[in-house]
Amino acid sequence: MALRRIYGTETEYGIVHRGVKDSNPISASSFLINAYLSTTSDQGVGPNAPRVGWDFIDETPEIDIRGFAPIGSLPPEIEANLVNAVLTNGSRYYVDHAHPELSTPECLDPLSLLRWDRAGDEIIVKSMKAANEVLPPGEEIIVYKNNSDGKGNSYGCHENYLISREIPFGRIVQHATTHFVTRQIFTGAGKVGSEAVGEKRMETPFQLTQRADFFEEEVGLETTLKRPIINTRDEPHADPLKYR
Protein backbone atom coordinates (compact mmCIF):
# COMPACT_ATOMS: atom_id res chain seq x y z
CA MET A 1 0.00 0.00 0.00
CA ALA A 2 1.40 3.39 -0.98
CA LEU A 3 2.10 5.84 1.84
CA ARG A 4 -0.29 8.79 1.87
CA ARG A 5 1.68 12.01 1.78
CA ILE A 6 1.00 15.60 2.75
CA TYR A 7 2.00 18.23 0.18
CA GLY A 8 2.57 21.96 0.37
CA THR A 9 4.55 24.79 -1.19
CA GLU A 10 5.97 28.11 -0.02
CA THR A 11 6.42 30.71 -2.73
CA GLU A 12 8.43 33.91 -2.39
CA TYR A 13 7.45 36.57 -4.90
CA GLY A 14 9.54 39.41 -6.30
CA ILE A 15 8.16 42.89 -5.66
CA VAL A 16 8.89 46.45 -6.82
CA HIS A 17 7.33 49.76 -5.81
CA ARG A 18 7.48 52.12 -8.77
CA GLY A 19 7.13 55.86 -8.68
CA VAL A 20 8.94 56.41 -5.36
CA LYS A 21 12.44 57.74 -4.77
CA ASP A 22 13.54 55.09 -2.28
CA SER A 23 11.65 51.84 -2.78
CA ASN A 24 11.53 49.62 0.33
CA PRO A 25 10.53 46.02 -0.46
CA ILE A 26 9.61 45.25 3.16
CA SER A 27 7.22 48.21 3.36
CA ALA A 28 5.86 47.42 -0.10
CA SER A 29 5.23 43.79 0.88
CA SER A 30 3.43 44.83 4.06
CA PHE A 31 1.34 47.38 2.15
CA LEU A 32 0.44 44.76 -0.47
CA ILE A 33 -0.79 42.19 2.02
CA ASN A 34 -2.65 44.68 4.20
CA ALA A 35 -4.38 46.04 1.10
CA TYR A 36 -5.66 42.56 0.30
CA LEU A 37 -6.78 41.90 3.88
CA SER A 38 -8.69 45.18 3.98
CA THR A 39 -10.80 44.17 0.99
CA THR A 40 -11.88 40.73 2.13
CA SER A 41 -15.08 40.13 4.02
CA ASP A 42 -13.98 36.69 5.23
CA GLN A 43 -14.38 36.37 8.97
CA GLY A 44 -11.09 36.48 10.82
CA VAL A 45 -8.89 37.93 8.08
CA GLY A 46 -10.03 41.54 7.75
CA PRO A 47 -8.15 44.62 8.95
CA ASN A 48 -9.43 44.25 12.53
CA ALA A 49 -8.79 40.52 12.78
CA PRO A 50 -6.66 39.34 15.72
CA ARG A 51 -3.05 38.48 14.98
CA VAL A 52 -2.14 34.82 14.81
CA GLY A 53 0.41 33.72 17.38
CA TRP A 54 3.27 31.47 16.28
CA ASP A 55 4.98 29.12 18.71
CA PHE A 56 8.48 28.18 17.55
CA ILE A 57 9.67 26.72 20.85
CA ASP A 58 9.95 23.17 19.47
CA GLU A 59 11.59 24.16 16.19
CA THR A 60 15.33 23.77 15.71
CA PRO A 61 16.14 24.81 12.13
CA GLU A 62 19.91 24.66 12.70
CA ILE A 63 19.99 20.91 13.38
CA ASP A 64 21.70 19.24 10.44
CA ILE A 65 20.35 16.03 8.95
CA ARG A 66 23.93 14.73 8.92
CA GLY A 67 23.89 14.56 12.71
CA PHE A 68 25.15 17.83 14.16
CA ALA A 69 24.08 21.37 15.03
CA PRO A 70 26.02 24.64 15.18
CA ILE A 71 26.95 25.81 18.67
CA GLY A 72 24.35 28.13 20.13
CA SER A 73 21.57 27.26 17.67
CA LEU A 74 18.20 28.46 18.94
CA PRO A 75 14.57 28.39 17.84
CA PRO A 76 13.89 31.11 15.23
CA GLU A 77 12.81 34.56 16.32
CA ILE A 78 9.55 35.61 14.72
CA GLU A 79 9.55 39.13 13.31
CA ALA A 80 6.37 40.08 15.12
CA ASN A 81 6.15 43.52 13.56
CA LEU A 82 5.71 42.12 10.04
CA VAL A 83 2.40 41.16 8.47
CA ASN A 84 1.48 37.55 9.15
CA ALA A 85 -2.02 36.35 8.22
CA VAL A 86 -3.78 33.01 7.96
CA LEU A 87 -6.43 33.03 5.24
CA THR A 88 -9.71 31.15 5.34
CA ASN A 89 -8.50 28.60 2.79
CA GLY A 90 -5.72 27.57 5.17
CA SER A 91 -2.95 29.46 3.40
CA ARG A 92 -0.47 31.65 5.24
CA TYR A 93 0.18 35.07 3.69
CA TYR A 94 3.07 37.00 5.19
CA VAL A 95 6.18 39.11 4.78
CA ASP A 96 9.35 37.04 4.73
CA HIS A 97 12.35 39.38 4.95
CA ALA A 98 11.96 41.48 1.78
CA HIS A 99 9.29 39.46 -0.01
CA PRO A 100 5.60 38.69 0.12
CA GLU A 101 5.34 34.95 0.65
CA LEU A 102 2.35 32.64 0.41
CA SER A 103 2.26 29.11 1.81
CA THR A 104 -0.44 26.73 0.66
CA PRO A 105 -2.52 24.73 3.12
CA GLU A 106 -1.56 21.11 3.65
CA CYS A 107 -2.83 19.04 0.71
CA LEU A 108 -3.37 15.30 0.35
CA ASP A 109 -2.70 14.97 -3.38
CA PRO A 110 -0.71 16.79 -6.08
CA LEU A 111 -3.80 18.07 -7.92
CA SER A 112 -5.12 19.77 -4.78
CA LEU A 113 -1.72 21.34 -4.26
CA LEU A 114 -1.71 22.68 -7.81
CA ARG A 115 -5.14 24.22 -7.28
CA TRP A 116 -4.12 25.96 -4.06
CA ASP A 117 -0.87 27.12 -5.61
CA ARG A 118 -2.79 28.72 -8.48
CA ALA A 119 -5.23 30.18 -5.95
CA GLY A 120 -2.22 31.83 -4.33
CA ASP A 121 -1.34 33.48 -7.63
CA GLU A 122 -4.89 34.83 -7.85
CA ILE A 123 -4.57 36.23 -4.33
CA ILE A 124 -1.41 38.03 -5.41
CA VAL A 125 -3.20 39.53 -8.44
CA LYS A 126 -6.07 40.73 -6.23
CA SER A 127 -3.55 42.13 -3.76
CA MET A 128 -1.86 44.19 -6.47
CA LYS A 129 -5.20 45.56 -7.60
CA ALA A 130 -6.21 46.47 -4.05
CA ALA A 131 -2.85 48.11 -3.32
CA ASN A 132 -2.69 50.13 -6.52
CA GLU A 133 -6.21 51.47 -6.01
CA VAL A 134 -5.14 53.30 -2.85
CA LEU A 135 -1.60 54.33 -3.79
CA PRO A 136 -0.99 57.99 -4.74
CA PRO A 137 -1.07 58.85 -8.47
CA GLY A 138 2.13 57.85 -10.22
CA GLU A 139 2.93 55.00 -7.82
CA GLU A 140 2.48 51.31 -8.55
CA ILE A 141 3.28 48.00 -6.84
CA ILE A 142 4.15 45.13 -9.16
CA VAL A 143 4.67 41.53 -8.02
CA TYR A 144 6.62 38.99 -10.04
CA LYS A 145 6.63 35.21 -9.83
CA ASN A 146 10.31 34.75 -10.57
CA ASN A 147 13.47 33.49 -8.85
CA SER A 148 15.96 36.33 -9.33
CA ASP A 149 15.81 40.08 -9.78
CA GLY A 150 18.58 40.51 -12.34
CA LYS A 151 20.74 42.31 -9.76
CA GLY A 152 22.24 39.31 -8.00
CA ASN A 153 19.42 38.58 -5.54
CA SER A 154 17.65 35.22 -5.56
CA TYR A 155 14.57 33.80 -3.86
CA GLY A 156 12.35 30.90 -4.67
CA CYS A 157 9.70 28.27 -4.17
CA HIS A 158 10.56 25.80 -1.41
CA GLU A 159 9.93 22.08 -1.39
CA ASN A 160 9.98 20.13 1.85
CA TYR A 161 9.98 16.34 2.09
CA LEU A 162 9.21 14.13 5.07
CA ILE A 163 11.32 10.97 4.80
CA SER A 164 11.99 7.90 6.89
CA ARG A 165 15.14 7.87 9.02
CA GLU A 166 15.71 4.33 7.84
CA ILE A 167 16.67 5.59 4.37
CA PRO A 168 20.43 6.28 4.19
CA PHE A 169 21.02 9.98 3.58
CA GLY A 170 23.63 9.26 0.92
CA ARG A 171 21.02 7.39 -1.08
CA ILE A 172 18.68 10.38 -0.95
CA VAL A 173 21.42 12.71 -2.16
CA GLN A 174 22.36 10.36 -4.99
CA HIS A 175 18.90 10.12 -6.48
CA ALA A 176 17.28 13.43 -5.48
CA THR A 177 20.14 15.58 -6.79
CA THR A 178 19.89 14.01 -10.21
CA HIS A 179 16.15 14.64 -10.28
CA PHE A 180 16.37 18.26 -9.10
CA VAL A 181 19.02 19.14 -11.68
CA THR A 182 17.63 17.37 -14.74
CA ARG A 183 14.01 18.47 -14.25
CA GLN A 184 15.06 22.03 -15.09
CA ILE A 185 15.05 20.93 -18.72
CA PHE A 186 11.26 20.60 -18.47
CA THR A 187 10.30 23.01 -15.68
CA GLY A 188 12.93 25.76 -15.60
CA ALA A 189 11.55 29.31 -15.69
CA GLY A 190 14.41 30.56 -17.89
CA LYS A 191 16.14 33.92 -17.99
CA VAL A 192 18.28 36.10 -20.21
CA GLY A 193 21.84 36.79 -19.05
CA SER A 194 23.85 35.66 -16.04
CA GLU A 195 24.07 36.76 -12.41
CA ALA A 196 26.92 34.44 -11.47
CA VAL A 197 29.88 36.01 -9.69
CA GLY A 198 32.69 36.78 -12.10
CA GLU A 199 30.60 36.52 -15.25
CA LYS A 200 29.47 39.36 -17.49
CA ARG A 201 25.70 39.48 -17.59
CA MET A 202 25.07 39.37 -21.34
CA GLU A 203 27.82 36.88 -22.21
CA THR A 204 25.20 34.23 -21.39
CA PRO A 205 22.35 34.70 -23.90
CA PHE A 206 19.84 32.40 -22.19
CA GLN A 207 19.56 29.96 -19.28
CA LEU A 208 16.97 27.25 -18.67
CA THR A 209 16.76 28.08 -14.98
CA GLN A 210 16.83 31.40 -13.14
CA ARG A 211 18.46 30.06 -9.99
CA ALA A 212 21.41 27.98 -11.20
CA ASP A 213 23.74 30.99 -10.90
CA PHE A 214 23.28 31.01 -7.14
CA PHE A 215 24.01 27.40 -6.18
CA GLU A 216 27.49 26.67 -4.84
CA GLU A 217 27.14 23.38 -2.94
CA GLU A 218 25.50 20.03 -3.56
CA VAL A 219 24.56 19.55 0.11
CA GLY A 220 24.49 22.03 3.00
CA LEU A 221 22.52 23.78 5.74
CA GLU A 222 22.72 27.39 4.52
CA THR A 223 19.82 29.07 2.72
CA THR A 224 21.25 32.43 1.66
CA LEU A 225 25.01 31.77 1.48
CA LYS A 226 26.68 28.84 -0.25
CA ARG A 227 23.24 27.69 -1.33
CA PRO A 228 22.98 23.90 -1.73
CA ILE A 229 20.84 21.84 -4.07
CA ILE A 230 19.77 19.74 -1.08
CA ASN A 231 19.30 21.53 2.23
CA THR A 232 20.10 19.42 5.29
CA ARG A 233 17.75 21.06 7.81
CA ASP A 234 16.45 18.29 10.07
CA GLU A 235 13.03 19.57 11.14
CA PRO A 236 10.42 16.85 10.51
CA HIS A 237 7.32 18.33 12.28
CA ALA A 238 6.62 14.69 13.14
CA ASP A 239 8.09 11.94 15.31
CA PRO A 240 11.84 12.68 15.02
CA LEU A 241 12.69 9.07 15.80
CA LYS A 242 10.89 7.92 12.66
CA TYR A 243 11.21 10.81 10.25
CA ARG A 244 13.49 13.59 9.08
Task: State what each model feature region is.
Residues 149-150, 212-214:
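Acidic, glycine-rich active-site loops and adjacent beta-strand->loop/helix elements
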Residues 168-170:
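A short alpha->loop->secondary-structure connector
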Residues 1-144, 174-191, 200-202, 213, ...:
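Terminal catalytic/cofactor-binding subdomain
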Residues 164, 193-195:
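Hydrophobic, small-residue-rich alpha-helical packing segments that form membrane-like cores
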Residues 147-164:
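Histidine-centered divalent-metal-coordination microenvironment in nucleic-acid enzymes
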